[in-house]
Amino acid sequence: MPTLNMEKKNFIFKDLELKNTLVVPIIRSNMTDTATTRTQWDGTVTPANGETEDNLFNESHDWQFELRNKFNLKYTLGRHTFNLNDQFVFSDYRPKDDRMNEYLGFDPSSFPSKMTSNNIGLSYLFASSNNRFQNSLTISIYYLKSKIYRTSDALSKDKTESVFAPKQTNVNKTYYGFSEGLSYELWKGVRGKISFSHNVRIPDTGELFGNGMSIKPSVNLQPEVGDNLNIGVIMDKRNLLGLTRVQWETNFYYMYMKNMIRLFPADIRSIYINLGKTSTLGFDTDLKVDITPNVYAYFNLTLQDIRDRQKWLNDEKGSDNPTYDKHVPNIPSFYYNYGMEYHVEGLLGKTELSRVYVDVSHVGEFDWGWQMSTLPDQRKKWIIPSNDVFTIGLQQSFWHNNVSLSFEVENIFDKENYMEFKMPLQGRTFKAKLRFNLFRDKVSGGAMSM
């Protein structure tokens, strides 16, 4: 993936910092499904057109070209900091499947989907002379232009010609956002904070275009627009109770969102759609402890209640919404993870780094569909059971930290676990990763960092 980074201090004039990152992903995805038979669970072999449930042959060779650019200008004047940030994305998705011509009646490669988005924000940060009081104000403008051809939907005839063509959806809108945050150091190393924001999240290309297989292109997908309130406490103490360093952050938050983007079933596939109105009331806490300079432990936990707040099926008071005030499915309400690692420098060489770690994650049970019944048998049908995943691993650097080698065993007890939509997670899994720092870039921390 071609990437170009550029950084410059004192750009144009003193104290003006420039950072720019340009990434050009080029993605080729292929799916070949030409199976003529299907084997059932009991061993019975039946005729089929492909293995997927839509009973259609697939031989796709899709291309996706993207251009992503992040631009940032930062200027500091005494206790005042000004920051201009721009994030631009252009994506061109070109599906191609010759077998589709046989049952769709058109060549999907003639109908590329495109998306252009831009997010520009200007922020102002003020810090008092002793940094005890800090204030941050940001104003943002968001732009989204998308043209999506729903090549997996039913065909519609062109109004001007007697030919079949895929349905098309267009979005061309501009949005605004802002955020205001205050923090104050209550005691040395302990800071309280409060923030309010009106944010917009532009859908990404995977949500808009689908994946050409199990996820369909989205229909009139709109950006998420949310109002957020956050109140929290941050602590950062060194040499506390004999510990090298203790970092702790906890937050209480409330979010009211319009057009929340979620993945839902659509016929035999899935599609990203907008939920009209939702609310989130939550709490999270994150604890990091350097027990000694070489031993590190952590724990984080999240509790959240996300509910549908669309009382009517449309903006006019007509039909009641049957899912009103119910939990939004496929989002866990309770999860946590904790772990510990031992890291050391110089064990296998003067500048080499070594790490051994263990990680445990827990996700409480949650529903994978709207819970419409109070009957125990029906509720059990839609519940994804809680799961625990234990992971151990080690990492070692070589060649003056320009090469790192890591091994990891995930789900070491080989437990049966499920994710969203009750899709099974992998059992015991062995992973290995080799990383190179070919240009010996010290700014990135080498091939491995603590």
Describe the function of each predicted region.
Residues 1, 5, 52-60, 101-112, ...:
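Extracellular loop and loop/strand-boundary signature of outer-membrane beta-barrel proteins
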Residues 9-13, 76-80, 117, 127-133, ...:
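Outer-membrane beta-barrel channels and translocator barrels
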Residues 1, 30-48, 94-103, 147-156, ...:
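Outer-membrane beta-barrel translocator domains and adjoining extracellular loop/strand segments
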Residues 24-30, 77-79, 88-94, 126-130, ...:
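Transmembrane beta-strands of outer-membrane beta-barrel pores
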Residues 79, 247-256, 273-368:
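Gram-negative outer-membrane beta-barrel transporters
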Residues 1-161, 174-177, 183-187, 195-197, ...:
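Face-selective signature of the C-terminal outer-membrane beta-barrel domain
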Residues 185, 192-197, 223-281, 302, ...:
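Membrane-embedded beta-barrel scaffold of Gram-negative outer-membrane proteins
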Residues 123-125, 180-185, 194, 224-230, ...:
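Conserved C-terminal beta-signal and adjacent last beta-strands/turns
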